[in-house]
């Protein structure tokens, strides 16, 4: 796997789970002899929702909610076969979305 790169993007609502999963990925890659760049924190997406509390009148009575989507990026440069095999066997938290691309 010469001159290749694995780019891993992690997304989730809980930043602690993302940081924990990122640490597991980095530790696994370094243990198998690959060079790691990252974790790089990407901008957090904040979605805000405003909901009327009252069913009929009182437009002033509102609640506001927010969902934050945290993202991290990890690049693994020149991965070995052991690195790819170890990453495939890695079991990450359920609240983390993982996207892997080869480049």
Swiss-Prot record:
Keywords: Ribonucleoprotein, Ribosomal protein. It comes from the Bacteria. InterPro entries: Ribosomal_uS10, Ribosomal_uS10_CS, Ribosomal_uS10_dom, Ribosomal_uS10_dom_sf. It holds the Pfam family Ribosomal_S10. The keyword Ribonucleoprotein applies. One of its GO terms (cellular component) is ribosome. GO terms for molecular function: structural constituent of ribosome; tRNA binding. One of its GO terms (biological process) is translation. The keyword RNA-binding does not apply. Belongs to the universal ribosomal protein uS10 family. Involved in the binding of tRNA to the ribosomes. Part of the 30S ribosomal subunit. This is Small ribosomal subunit protein uS10. It comes from Shewanella denitrificans (strain OS217 / ATCC BAA-1090 / DSM 15013).
């Amino acid at each position: 796997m010469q001159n290749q790169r694995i780019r891993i993007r992690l997304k989730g609502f809980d930043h602690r789970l993302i940081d924990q999963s990122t640490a597991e990925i980095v530790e696994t890659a370094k243990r198998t002899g690959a060079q790691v760049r990252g974790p790089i924190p990407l901008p957090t997406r904040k979605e805000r929702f405003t909901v009327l509390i009252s069913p009929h009148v009182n437009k002033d009575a509102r609640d506001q909610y927010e969902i934050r989507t945290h993202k991290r990026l990890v690049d693994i440069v020149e991965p070995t076969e052991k690195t790819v095999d170890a990453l495939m066997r890695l079991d990450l938290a359920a609240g983390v979305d993982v996207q892997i691309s080869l480049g």
